[in-house]
Design a protein with these regions (language model features):
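N-terminal helix-turn-helix DNA-binding module of bacterial transcription factors
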Residues: 1-64
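Flexible loop/hinge segments that line or gate small-molecule binding clefts
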Residues: 103, 125-170, 177-181, 249, ...
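Hinge/beta->alpha junction and helix N-cap segments in small-molecule ligand-binding domains
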Residues: 71-80, 98-107, 160-170, 185-231, ...
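Periplasmic-binding protein-like
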Residues: 120-126, 183-186, 218, 236-247, ...
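Short helix-capping segments at alpha-helix termini
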Residues: 91-92, 141, 206-213, 236-238, ...
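Flexible loop/turn connectors
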Residues: 232-293
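Amphipathic helical "hinge" segments at domain boundaries
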Residues: 49-114, 118-122, 188, 199-203
Length: 293
């Protein structure tokens, strides 16, 4: 049997006050006598009244809800970003609604429209790439949009990111202290972060270190552990003795693949990865990583 929904009217009637008074108590308004406040709170507790968040949102023009679009909720990097967003949202008494897009352009648009239809106060869009379709969708909304994990090459949409060019240059220079052949293992180069920012940082570091750039040392792959594992033999065959890897799960796969093929890491092969997610602490040896915000 369905339980009857308790409304603000029920609380007001039971407490013998107006609905406006109940609303003031619920919203923490101090302009209520303490005896009245206590009486209303007692009724709220007894009836197990829970304010309707949707109705409150319509009245205040705010839902205190932030939508979060994530490309792969199983990916440790994006999962850690989502956790961080939730921690901050909780601090400010906001809720988050997470939708998984699977990194698919069509599904991204669907989940974005679904979240915006729920009148979220803003949207955090986590992705590897920003497609023209999703950019066009964002241009039509008045809701605040912030990117994380992706950058807008046109600098029209704000993002929370590091300087990928500088970071990649710094770690490549660090590896260049002990290595002559350094590989770059990156996600799809069509993504601006990889094909533009990280690649340019990698090339700049090689030039500064007096090393020759070779396309044969640039490996394009997908963002997954199996992809890194599969890539290990090719990286080994290239003659590289170090690698800058742009995804932690790929880095762990590469590490295990190299170890399985008899390579001693880090004695014979050094790896620096990019996201500093928790899985970098679980490997043996542990992986050095670029720190993300």
């Amino acid at each position: 049997m369905e339980s009857e929904t308790i409304t603000i009217y029920d609380v007001a009637r039971e407490a013998g006050v107006s609905m406006a008074t109940v609303s003031r108590v619920v919203n923490g308004n101090q302009n209520v006598k303490e005896t009245t406040r206590r009486k209303v709170l007692d009724v709220i507790e007894r009836l197990d009244y829970r304010p309707n968040a949707v109705a409150r949102g319509l009245a205040s023009k705010k839902t205190t809800t932030v939508g979060v679009v994530i490309p792969d909720i199983a990916n440790s990097y994006f999962a850690s970003l989502a956790r961080g967003i939730d921690d901050i949202a909780t601090m400010y008494k906001y809720n988050i609604v997470i939708a998984n897009s699977d990194g698919d352009d069509g599904k991204e648009i669907n989940v974005v429209n679904t979240l915006l239809a729920k009148q979220v106060d803003g949207l955090v869009f986590l992705a590897h790439n920003l497609s023209d379709k999703i950019r066009a969708e964002f241009s039509r909304t008045r809701s605040p949009i912030v990117l994380a994990g992706a950058v807008d090459p046109e600098d029209q949409i704000p993002s929370v990111n590091i300087d990928y060019t500088v970071a990649t240059k710094e770690v490549t220079l660090e590896l260049a202290k002990n290595n002559q052949k350094i590989a770059l293992v990156a996600g799809p180069m069509v993504n601006a972060i990889n094909g533009k920012e990280r690649l340019s940082g990698y090339q700049a570091a090689l030039a500064e270190a007096g090393l020759t750039f070779s396309e044969g040392l640039v490996f394009e792959t997908t963002y997954s552990y199996p992809a890194g594992l599969k890539l290990a033999e090719r990286v080994k065959a290239s003659g590289a003795t170090a690698a800058v890897v742009t995804d932690d799960e790929v880095a762990v796969g590469l590490l295990n693949g190299l170890v399985n093929s008899g390579v001693n890491v880090p004695e014979d092969f050094e790896i620096i990865t990019a996201n500093n997610s928790v899985i970098t602490e679980f490997t043996r040896p542990t992986l050095s990583s670029i720190e993300q915000p």
